[in-house]
Amino acid sequence: AKGISVNVTLIFSLERYEQVIDAYIEGIAQAAANGHDLKHIGSVASFFVSRVDTAVDKLLEANGSDEAKALEGKAAVANARLAYELFEKKFAEDPRWADLAAKGAKVQRPLWASTGTKNAAYSDCKYVDELVAKHIVNTMPEKTLNALADHGNGAPSIEGTYEESHAIINKLAELGINLKDVTDKLEADGVAAFIKSWDSVLSDVQSGIDRVNA
């Protein structure tokens, strides 16, 4: 609303992501009303990926069934692909967006975070190659970037996957795994870790100030 570009981070669930998109569109609408040049406002929504597999795979391993085994390594990509489905739907259907876009507004781009592969059994390009689409930003670690340059695919890989992705989430639910419960915990843990890091930075700064003033 004030014309400031924003990175909204620590998004794990579709429910939270929808709130983020709604807030962005409302903010852009207010920015337009306040006379800001919409062409100069950018935003990304940082949606975390691999941590979801780390959490869900533990639950699947504890289940131990063949059905659970078949779902290992699939939850994170399915969740992210459904986030992209939501991205397409919201910006296509929100009645305010066409007018805002005509005034120069940019879509809030989905940014895949936590895209390094943590399970050695999976491709080291898994969370890049399987999540390629228009408007996507991917903040991959250097190791993943090097792997992608060496043997990655990089071809569009989200279009046409929504039905399969919904089916994966439904199968998890049938096994008693509520993905929202998983993502809610990941979000809470992530926020707590960010607060701890921020408090540590503030403490270091204050210590420096105290030394200068001593």
Language-model region placement:
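Catalytic alpha/beta core domains of metabolic enzymes, predominantly
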Residues: I4-K143
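Intrinsic disorder at enzyme termini
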Residues: V212-A214
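Flexible, acidic glycine-rich loops studded with aromatic residues
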Residues: A105-D210
